[in-house]
Amino acid sequence: MAQLQVTLEVAAGDLDAVDGALELAGALSQTYQADDGTVLLEPGVGEHPLWEQVRVDALFPPETDPDALHTLLAGQLGERLRGWQAETLEDRAWEREWLDHFRPMAFGERLWIVPTGAEPELPAGAVPIHLDPGLAFGTGTHETTALCLEWLDGEPIAGRNGLDYGAGSGILAVAAVRLGAACCMAVDNDPQAVVASRENAERNGVAEDVPSYAVDQRPAYCADFLVANILASTLVDLADELRDGVRVGGRLALSGILRGQEQQVMDAFQGGIAWDAPRCCGDWVLVSGTRTA
């Protein structure tokens, strides 16, 4: 399907307002890119890149009238609407652009993220996760997602039940089941993310083992392992809920944490977790541990 792509130049302080306006205007997905070329596709729940200046590429349905869209956004954003560009990405051009950017990527010893439709030669024992060119909400390219994927790859989760809190695309829940977990529930507060999780689970043949729910609609569930890739402030606010989401003796991994924030996150759990040494990737940190009480 062709897409209308709108590009804006956004100051970091205006990003929340612009993000919300684009979503309300019907954006299907958004990509953030810094001046240095760093790309972040559809940040996780509540996550925003900490850059001074951000280029935002937003995709809209092909029937969207760009002039009417500009008028709508200008009315909402005023002077914050800067750098406007609009172009139509035809079917082949859009998919080609995605495939050119996303090569198969390895995480840990076994996991590979592969664009749907690509058939790369992977090493023996590789566990591929297929993602769609039109995917929103995360692809593994961001450091926090990479840290979580590598953690899952190194954990003995075979036959166990997991919980992916703030699942976005469901990439972590899908990866867990593809690595041998019996089940991994994906929960998110964004309805589009719930749909994306279900679609990606179906795409990878694990739909029955990756149930997806809105946060406030999920059934009671206590997991053997839990992974949450959301902002540090949200992890702090949800510490009790996250701790209670995993059984005593179970494992949890938390990311979306900037260097220097890890102690604040761990302290929020007020004991009851035996923490491992933090793992770092760039400016980001993953903390993991075992629930002891």
Swiss-Prot record:
NCBIfam families: prmA (TIGR00406). GO terms for cellular component: cytosol. Belongs to the methyltransferase superfamily. PrmA family. Its EC number is 2.1.1.-. It catalyses: L-lysyl-[protein] + 3 S-adenosyl-L-methionine = N(6),N(6),N(6)-trimethyl-L-lysyl-[protein] + 3 S-adenosyl-L-homocysteine + 3 H(+). Keywords: Cytoplasm, Methyltransferase, S-adenosyl-L-methionine, Transferase. S-adenosyl-L-methionine binds at residues 145, 166, 188, 229. It is an enzyme of class 2 (transferase). It is found in: Cytoplasm. This is Ribosomal protein L11 methyltransferase. Pfam families: PrmA. The keyword Calcium does not apply. It comes from Halorhodospira halophila (strain DSM 244 / SL1) (Ectothiorhodospira halophila (strain DSM 244 / SL1)). GO terms for biological process: methylation. One of its GO terms (molecular function) is protein-lysine N-methyltransferase activity. Methylates ribosomal protein L11. Its main location: cytoplasm.
